[in-house]
Structure formats: structure tokens, C-alpha cells
């Protein structure tokens, strides 16, 4: 083929595949959030004939809550994601980390009572840990009914790992396996370790401001006294600044920024994320800080832990110590060496491989013979 013929072919392909709008000189970036989210929505669109893309408001124990179900094949095993916080939703960042999951799982994201898209000032007084336990049971019942699958995988992150572990203990018959990411075991002990780590970092870095502020809340999380939220926020300020929430980053703002690009969220939803988290933390965190699963030493369901090596926000070392004592039909622990607390977005590739290679086969092992996704990718 001559050079002129090749050039003509390239030019023809260009005009065939690119619209005039894209060709316009200087028109190289989205002009608004709406345009940006439309691009992302197009990239993640599920186009398989049997595919499922559902985003709907569901009545959960009298409170309207948003649930999404996404899958290229709804026969694939269900994976319910229970977000952390309290109030730190995963749905609006799942466009980044979970698209690959949807090829092999039926992925369910749930914005918990009062969080994210489910924010409603009228239900603030109903935000209790007991109510959240009732809600997760109701959500699981709804998901089982809607998908026609009796068992599912439950992935709980951070605060969501408390709810998830509770379900695993009470209703192992509902689960193929429980997956804990940033697993909460004993919050008071985790807080103590976090304070000590932050103080040591401050000393080594010669950060006088950090040392002074951390010293101002000492002794921190000692005994059974209630931990004031103001003390918690100050401890977290320095834990996060020193990389204990996101590895080698001063905070998790990179993740928070991704919320604005979610195709599932309206502008109002994005604004409500921050209001909702403030309310959820105020209402739920005192009880979370007093919670402990350290005495739980046996589960009747396979357990997989995903832990960030540098997680100080919720002590991964404490979770590993607990896991060593735990008895379960099958258990595996996976370390994420380049992550702290936000491993889902810090190492999404390794998360995906772990889900495919280590989690997915458990659906077949627990009797889901119809599951299409249990065959690993070739």
C-alpha cells in the first residue's frame, strides 16, 4: 500500500469513528460535571443482552434507601458491598474500582440509611447501630428475592465490616463467604494504637504542632470512658496526615474528589454526601467506638480479610492478630502492601485479582452450580 493510500485510509477511519463534536478545535475536555459523568456512564454501560443496570429507591424498614444492581450476567454470584464511614459511601466511587467486578459478579451497592443518595434529614433520629443491623438484614432479604439467589458474598469495608461480621455470625447460611476490608475488631484498642503511631511519627519527623495537639488529648482511648468526637477528629487529623488512611498521601481527598464524577449521583447527591457523613458520624460513631468483636473466635462461613499494610485508621495489625485466632471452615488473609485504609481505590487491580482468584470459586464450592462467573477468565 502506498503512503498516500495509507494516509487516506487513516483519514477515512478517523471520520468513521469520531464525531464532528470531538473533532472541533479546542473541544478537548468536558465543559461540565454533566458532560464528564456522561462519558463515564458510556464507558461503564452494560451492553450484554442479559445485563442488568438497576438503580432504585427501596423501602427498607420504613426508610427510602438507594440500591444499585449491576452485572453483565445476573446469574453470576451476588456481591453485596457494605460501605464504611459511618456515612462514607462506596457507590459514587465504584465507577472507578468495580467495573471489572461486574463481569464476574452481580454487584450490589447500597447507600445505607441516611448516607449518600439516601440522605434524609427526617430520619436522623433513627440512625442507631441496632437499626442498621435491622436494615442490613432487610437489604439482604430484598437482594436475595430480586436476584433469585439464596446466598451471596458480603464485602464489608471499615464500619461496614462491623455490620458484615455481625451478619456472618448470625446468618452464615446467607453467605458464600464474608470478606472484610479494613476490618474493625476492637475500636478502642485500634484508637490507642493509632494515637501511639501518630505520636511516634510526629517525634521522628520533628513535627512540634502534631506532638502538641496529640499530647493535648492524652491519655487517649484509655479505659472505658467515652471518646469525645473532637478527640477522635484530632487523632485522625494526624493519622491521616502521616499516611495512615491512604498510603504515601496526606489524606483521602483523591478518593473524595472521584465522587463528583459518579454517573449515579446528581449534583444534589454529591452535596449531600458531606452533610450525610457529618450526621452519620455524630449519631453512630460513639457506639462504633465502643464496639468490639475481639471475643468472636469462631464463624461457620469462609472468611477472607483484605488488609492494607499501612492501615492505621483502623489497625490492620490488630485485625491480623484477631484473624490468627479465628476458626472458620476456610480463611485467607491478603495484605495490600501499597495501601492503608482505602485499599479498594489504592490497589484496585490486586483487589480485582483477589476477588476473581480467591473469592469467586467459593460460590461453586458452596453450591451455586448455576453461577456463570465461577469460571476464571482465560
PLM features per residue range, with description:
Residues 102-119:
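Conserved alpha/beta-hydrolase
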Residues 133-151:
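Conserved acidic catalytic loop of the alpha/beta-hydrolase fold
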Residues 205-294, 301:
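Alpha/beta-hydrolase
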Residues 91-92, 114-127:
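Glycine-rich "HGGG/HGxG" loop immediately N-terminal to the catalytic nucleophile
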Residues 299, 305-307:
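Short beta-strand/loop motif that positions the catalytic acidic residue
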Residues 176-221:
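A catalytic-pocket lid/entrance helix-loop region that shapes and gates access to the active site
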Residues 339-348:
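Catalytic histidine-centered segment of alpha/beta-hydrolase-like enzymes
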Residues 150-188:
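Conserved hydrolase catalytic core segment
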Amino acid at each position: 500500500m502506498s503512503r498516500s493510500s495509507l494516509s487516506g485510509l487513516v483519514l477515512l477511519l478517523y471520520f468513521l469513528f469520531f464525531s464532528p463534536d470531538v473533532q472541533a478545535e479546542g473541544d478537548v475536555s468536558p465543559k461540565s460535571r454533566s458532560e464528564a459523568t456522561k462519558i463515564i456512564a458510556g464507558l461503564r454501560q452494560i451492553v450484554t443482552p442479559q445485563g442488568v443496570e438497576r438503580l432504585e429507591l427501596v423501602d427498607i424498614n420504613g426508610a427510602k434507601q438507594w440500591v444499585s444492581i449491576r452485572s453483565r450476567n445476573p446469574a453470576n454470584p451476588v456481591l453485596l458491598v457494605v460501605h464504611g464511614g459511618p456515612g462514607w459511601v462506596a457507590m459514587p466511587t465504584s465507577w472507578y474500582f468495580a467495573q471489572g467486578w461486574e463481569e464476574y459478579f452481580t454487584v450490589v451497592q447500597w447507600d445505607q440509611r441516611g448516607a449518600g443518595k439516601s440522605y434524609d434529614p427526617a430520619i436522623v433520629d433513627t440512625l442507631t447501630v441496632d437499626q442498621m443491623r435491622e436494615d442490613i438484614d432487610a437489604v439482604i432479604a430484598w437482594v436475595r428475592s430480586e436476584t433469585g439467589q439464596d446466598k451471596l458474598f458480603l464485602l464489608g469495608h471499615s464500619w461496614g465490616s462491623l455490620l458484615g461480621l455481625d451478619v456472618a455470625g448470625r446468618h452464615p447460611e446467607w453467605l458464600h463467604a464474608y470478606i472484610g476490608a479494613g476490618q474493625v475488631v476492637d475500636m478502642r484498642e485500634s484508637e490507642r494504637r493509632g494515637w501511639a503511631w501518630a505520636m511516634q511519627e510526629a517525634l521522628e519527623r520533628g513535627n512540634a504542632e502534631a506532638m502538641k495537639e496529640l499530647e493535648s488529648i492524652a491519655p487517649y482511648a484509655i479505659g472505658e470512658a467515652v471518646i469525645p468526637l473532637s478527640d477522635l477528629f484530632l487523632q485522625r487529623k494526624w493519622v491521616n496526615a502521616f499516611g495512615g488512611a491512604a498510603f504515601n498521601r496526606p489524606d483521602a481527598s483523591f478518593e473524595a474528589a472521584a465522587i463528583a464524577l459518579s454517573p449515579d449521583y446528581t449534583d444534589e447527591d454529591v452535596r449531600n454526601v458531606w452533610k450525610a457523613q457529618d450526621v452519620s458520624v455524630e449519631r453512630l460513631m460513639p457506639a462504633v467506638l465502643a464496639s468490639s468483636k475481639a471475643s468472636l473466635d469462631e464463624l461457620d462461613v469462609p472468611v477472607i480479610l483484605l488488609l492494607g499494610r499501612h492501615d492505621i485508621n483502623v489497625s490492620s495489625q490488630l485485625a491480623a492478630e484477631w484473624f490468627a485466632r479465628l476458626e472458620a471452615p476456610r480463611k485467607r488473609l491478603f495484605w495490600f502492601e501499597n495501601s492503608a485504609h482505602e485499599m479498594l481505590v489504592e490497589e484496585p487491580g490486586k483487589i480485582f485479582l483477589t476477588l476473581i482468584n480467591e473469592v469467586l470459586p467459593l460460590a461453586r464450592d458452596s453450591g451455586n452450580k448455576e453461577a456463570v462467573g465461577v469460571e476464571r477468565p482465560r
